[in-house]
């Protein structure tokens, strides 16, 4: 398929589609650093600067749009689908509406965060699905955990696929696997495992993950990186992962974002974390691309319970019909790679200040029961860091 990419970021959707036999005809990305990453890794493909400057949607088989999540995420401003950033997806529909029905792109692929299913009672999903139906598309969406492809990062994202002439259920609901209980709780630890967590949190939650890391974030609004930490009980060490391992956790090759800026300087690490944290998992889009090339058929017609008040984790619809779909977040069941075996680069030890901040928050936390072994190990790590000063 020929792909037109909007809100391209660093090309996570497109790399996965390329790996499954599809080609990108044009990118559209406003961020200068993301554009530089695209230029480096997709040489020769045209890059438009701003979706607001596009007057006509080029002819294609599929439009990919991982539109901005800042207004829809739990950590963002929560302005919703009418926010200045997430609301840019409306431009996509304006471009499609300009075309005659028969000339509209046969497929539309949209990606965003699961929180949009709950924010403002799911107003964003209500908007997306209603507009797609008005434009003549049948749609299906599913929340997918990228960890099901074997990479040790827990990452849930909503994948919305719409088709003008075919049935998107044959792509989105062609596989389903039970979700394993992988992560356990911070109150119980095993010496043989590594544990991932958010060292910047600790007061209300920690993102605990056994032999994996919680979702890679894009960092702060001022470009300060906040990579997840990994703790090894056996080695009695705790540190943050390397940006090159973070790229691999997202399905990219190492140094995908290692570019030279327009000023001739090397890109700052905080900027790389932002780019990688905002990216779509390559493994997820590769799965979609493979199923688009060879649809396996939906495991059921799913014409049972209708969507009523709240949006479920998966659904499909056409016209004014919206059906719940009882499937898991695991579309594959690839053998899991432990984070202890996955990392190519050493952990960067957390500073005494960072550890002290986390330990202080953990001490005040009332809804997470941290094991004494975890807390005591972090105290020892802090003491060793202080001795170095």
UniProtKB/Swiss-Prot annotation:
UniProt cross-references to Pfam families, sorted A to Z: DNA_methylase
Catalyzed reaction equations: a 2'-deoxycytidine in DNA + S-adenosyl-L-methionine = a 5-methyl-2'-deoxycytidine in DNA + S-adenosyl-L-homocysteine + H(+)
GO biological process, one term: DNA restriction-modification system
Keyword Cell wall biogenesis/degradation appears in the UniProt entry: no
pH curve summary: Optimum pH is 8.0.
UniProt temperature dependence: Rapidly loses activity at 37 degrees Celsius in the absence of DNA.
Source organism per UniProt: Bacillus subtilis (strain 168)
Activity modulation: Somewhat inhibited by MgCl(2) and spermidine, strongly inhibited by MnCl(2).
Stated name of the protein: Type II methyltransferase M2.BsuMI
Membership in a protein family: Belongs to the class I-like SAM-binding methyltransferase superfamily. C5-methyltransferase family.
Keyword terms: Methyltransferase, Restriction system, S-adenosyl-L-methionine, Transferase
Phylogenetic classification of the source organism: Bacteria, Bacillati, Bacillota, Bacilli, Bacillales
Gene disruption phenotype: Essential for growth, it can be disrupted once one of the components of the corresponding BsuMI restriction endonuclease complex (AC O34303, O34885, O35025, YdjA, YdiS and YdiR respectively) has been disrupted. Triple deletions ydiO-ydiP-ydiR, ydiO-ydiP-ydiS and ydiO-ydiP-ydjA lead to loss of susceptibility to MspJI, which only digests C-methylated DNA.
Subunit-level organization: Monomer. May form a complex with YdiP, also seems to be active alone.
Domain SAM-dependent MTase C5-type: from-to ranges: 1-299
This protein's record includes keyword 4Fe-4S: no
Upregulation: Constitutively expressed during exponential growth. Encoded in an operon with ydiO and in a second with groES, groEL, ydiM and ydiN. This second operon is heat-inducible.
InterPro entries, sorted: C5-Methyltransferase, C5_DNA_meth_AS, C5_MeTfrase, C5_meth_CS, SAM-dependent_MTases_sf
Top-level enzyme category: transferase
GO molecular-function term, one example from the UniProt record: DNA (cytosine-5-)-methyltransferase activity
E.C. number: 2.1.1.37
Catalytic residues (UniProt): 69
Gene3D superfamilies: Vaccinia Virus protein VP39
């Amino acid at each position: 398929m020929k792909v037109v990419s909007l809100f391209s970021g660093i090309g996570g959707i497109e790399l996965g589609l390329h790996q499954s036999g599809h080609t990108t005809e044009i990118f559209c990305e406003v961020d200068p650093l993301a554009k530089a990453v695209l230029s480096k890794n997709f040489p020769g493909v045209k890059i438009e600067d701003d979706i607001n400057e596009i007057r006509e949607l080029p002819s294609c088989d599929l439009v990919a749009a991982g539109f901005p999540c800042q207004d829809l995420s739990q950590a963002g401003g929560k302005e919703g689908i009418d926010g200045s950033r997430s609301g840019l997806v409306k431009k996509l529909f304006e471009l499609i509406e300009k075309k005659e029905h028969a000339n509209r792109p046969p497929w539309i692929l949209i990606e965003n965060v699961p929180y949009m299913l709950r924010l403002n009672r799911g107003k964003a999903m209500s908007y997306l699905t209603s507009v797609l139906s008005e434009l003549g598309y049948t749609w299906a969406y599913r929340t997918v955990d990228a960890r099901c492809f074997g990479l040790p990062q827990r990452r849930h994202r909503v994948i919305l696929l719409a088709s003008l002439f075919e049935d998107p259920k044959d792509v989105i609901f062609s596989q389903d696997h039970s979700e394993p209980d992988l992560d356990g709780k911070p109150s119980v630890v095993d010496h043989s495992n590594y544990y991932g967590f958010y060292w910047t949190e600790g007061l209300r939650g920690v993102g605990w993950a056994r032999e994996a890391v919680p979702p890679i974030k894009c960092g702060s609004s001022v470009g300060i990186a906040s990579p997840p930490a990994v703790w090894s009980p056996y080695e009695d060490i705790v540190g943050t992962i390397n940006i090159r391992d973070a790229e691999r956790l997202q399905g990219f090759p190492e140094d995908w974002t290692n570019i030279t800026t327009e000023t001739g300087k090397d890109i700052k690490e905080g900027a790389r974390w932002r780019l990688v944290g905002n990216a779509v998992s390559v493994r997820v889009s590769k799965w979609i691309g493979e199923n688009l090339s060879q649809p396996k058929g939906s495991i059921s017609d799913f014409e049972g319970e209708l969507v009523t008040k709240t949006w479920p984790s998966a659904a499909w619809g056409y016209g004014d019909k919206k059906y719940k779909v009882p499937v898991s977040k695991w579309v594959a069941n690839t053998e899991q790679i432990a984070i202890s075996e996955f990392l190519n680069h050493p952990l960067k030890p957390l500073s005494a200040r960072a550890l002290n901040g986390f330990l202080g928050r953990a001490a005040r936390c009332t809804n997470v029961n941290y094991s004494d072994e975890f807390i005591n190990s972090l105290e020892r790590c802090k003491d060793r860091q202080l001795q170095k000063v």
